[in-house]
């Protein structure tokens, strides 16, 4: 788990960290993780095109880690909202959510494309 590896495995500790961040910091953290996830997924696709499926697998694993980090932060926001501690939405946060959604979709589609490449190589 992304947070556990950083000493933030405890839900209360994560909430404490989230409360100490500004909306801009939260949004940029989501954008950064989502962007890295997307880039890693496309690196996986590039490797798969060359038949380097083990490298592709490693890139996809790294991509999933970054997606999970962004998604966990988003989940914390949703939980805080449900607890009555919501944040005021702004364009930057909408942008962050767009990045997260498109990076997850890109990774999922790339996983399917890699499966097709493997079938074609058989």
Question: For each predicted feature, which ranges?
Answer:
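Terminal alpha-helical segments
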Residues: 18-122
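Single conserved hydrophobic/aromatic residue that forms the stacking wall/gate
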Residues: 1-15
